[in-house]
């Protein structure tokens, strides 16, 4: 049964469907009780990876239909206008900001709030948010903690990549860094001469170890670790997972080095077909009582974005595990971290997630987007008019399902409204 339903009956465009999944997608993965054996370099029987490679090919074939449109500025602009029109959350961000006194309401804010509301974490009152600017995750956690959990305080630390050039702007669009410098772990290039200088780059092993140390020195215990990192791949979406392997490993390792026992973790990923990504998920399965692959409804269904969620950390690293993983990051290669043949049941669950999120939902939406492009190339206003009534219904429903309440002024984050990206 399709995840989507028809809403415009009759007439020339009766094929139009809403672009909203009926549910928050959440696929559970089994906990692994057997010992974790990390390997610096290993091989995997091709049969284990065959269906993941096939899934990658199928998805990339559909993505490739958009590639010619990216080559010309005019067609690229039209395509993005169409994709923006079928974004069921367009307009919701402003409504949330003004109706609920919310701050930094980006799409990241919506996703994090939805994750918090759906995953039922035991405690989120102390958080380390990595790869964080401009600050949507922190703001959503702050809003959720005070309006839903009613914690007396919310304590947080954060980090983001600080540009290497002193002339480049830090993406501090809302002034969260500028007005809260003591909460941030990374440092300006002006401090390069310091022995423990750290620019927040989680692809550098020494940075990862240092960030985890700084986080735990400033905030203990850490109940929630989040990381929303992603490298801009331009138009090369077919290699999005591959190009982000090292970054996603680094942000995960930072979390596993800093998150307290009993804590929860949320990590951004894209497709989940590469052997290294699969092995990293296998590693996670040894540390959390519950592990999930998720796709919030507010995560645009035309993209490959997924979030891996770990609930209730059961144990910390052994010294040997920490040493092996840091060494792998320092001398990175993308062979699996573990012998994947030992994780057949878990990989079946991961593949079910791949089928559900990418082979069904994403492909259906990409095809829908291309059909809208062909039919509404010069009629974008007409498309918007058709979709507007259902967008309102869906956005109102989303607000009810996710239990939004007004944030009291005294609980708002300190922001510097004048900041537009650059920080002195």
UniProtKB/Swiss-Prot annotation:
Biological processes, Gene Ontology terms: 7-methylguanosine mRNA capping; methylation
Protein name as annotated: Probable methyltransferase EP424R
Domain Adrift-type SAM-dependent 2'-O-MTase: 103-315
Compartments in which it is found: Virion
GO annotations of cellular component type: virion component
Annotated coiled-coil segments of the chain: none
UniProt keywords, alphabetically: Early protein, Methyltransferase, S-adenosyl-L-methionine, Transferase, Virion
Stimuli inducing this protein: Expressed in the early phase of the viral replicative cycle.
One function term, GO molecular function aspect: mRNA (nucleoside-2'-O-)-methyltransferase activity
Main location: virion
Annotated TM spans: none
Active site, per annotation: 268 (proton acceptor)
Pfam families listed in its UniProt record: FtsJ
Enzyme Commission number(s) of this protein: 2.1.1.-
UniProt lineage: Viruses, Varidnaviria, Bamfordvirae, Nucleocytoviricota, Pokkesviricetes
């Amino acid at each position: 049964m399709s995840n989507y339903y028809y809403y415009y009956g009759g007439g020339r465009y009766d094929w139009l469907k809403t672009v909203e999944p009926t549910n928050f997608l959440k696929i559970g993965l089994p906990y692994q009780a057997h010992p974790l054996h990390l390997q610096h370099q290993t091989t995997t029987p091709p049969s284990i990876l065959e269906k993941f490679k096939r899934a990658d090919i199928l998805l990339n074939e559909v993505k490739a239909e958009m590639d010619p449109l990216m080559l010309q500025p005019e067609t690229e602009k039209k395509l993005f206008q169409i994709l923006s029109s079928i974004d069921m959350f367009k307009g919701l961000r402003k409504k949330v900001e003004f109706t609920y006194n919310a701050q930094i309401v980006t799409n990241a804010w919506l996703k994090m709030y939805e994750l918090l509301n759906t995953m039922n974490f035991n405690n989120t009152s102390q958080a380390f948010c990595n790869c964080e600017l401009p600050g949507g995750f922190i703001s959503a956690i702050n809003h959720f903690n005070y309006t839903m959990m009613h914690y007396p305080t919310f304590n947080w630390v954060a980090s983001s990549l600080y540009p290497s050039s002193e002339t480049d702007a830090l993406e501090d669009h809302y002034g969260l860094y500028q007005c809260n410098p003591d909460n941030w772990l990374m440092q300006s290039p002006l401090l390069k001469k310091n022995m423990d200088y750290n620019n927040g780059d989680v692809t550098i092993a020494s940075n990862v170890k240092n960030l985890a140390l700084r986080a735990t020195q400033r905030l203990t215990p850490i109940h929630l670790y989040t990381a929303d990192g992603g490298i801009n791949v331009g138009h090369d979406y077919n290699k999005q997972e591959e190009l982000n392997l090292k970054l996603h490993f680094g942000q995960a390792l930072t979390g596993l080095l800093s998150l307290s026992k009993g804590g929860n973790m949320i990590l951004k990923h894209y497709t989940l077909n590469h052997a290294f990504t699969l092995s990293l998920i296998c590693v996670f399965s040894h540390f959390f009582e519950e592990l999930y692959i998720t796709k919030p409804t507010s995560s645009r269904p035309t993209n490959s974005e997924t979030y891996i969620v770990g609930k209730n950390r059961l144990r910390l690293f052994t010294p040997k595990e920490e040493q092996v993983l840091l060494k792998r990051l320092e001398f990175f290669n993308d062979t699996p971290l573990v012998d994947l043949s030992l994780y057949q049941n878990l990989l079946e669950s991961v593949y079910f997630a791949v089928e559900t999120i990418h082979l069904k939902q994403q492909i259906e939406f990409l095809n829908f987007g291309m059909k809208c492009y062909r039919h509404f190339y010069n009629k974008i206003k007409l498309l918007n008019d058709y979709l507007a009534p259902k967008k309102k219904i869906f956005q109102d429903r989303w607000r009810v399902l996710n239990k939004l309440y007004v944030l009291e002024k005294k609980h708002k984050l300190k922001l510097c409204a004048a900041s537009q990206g650059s920080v002195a």
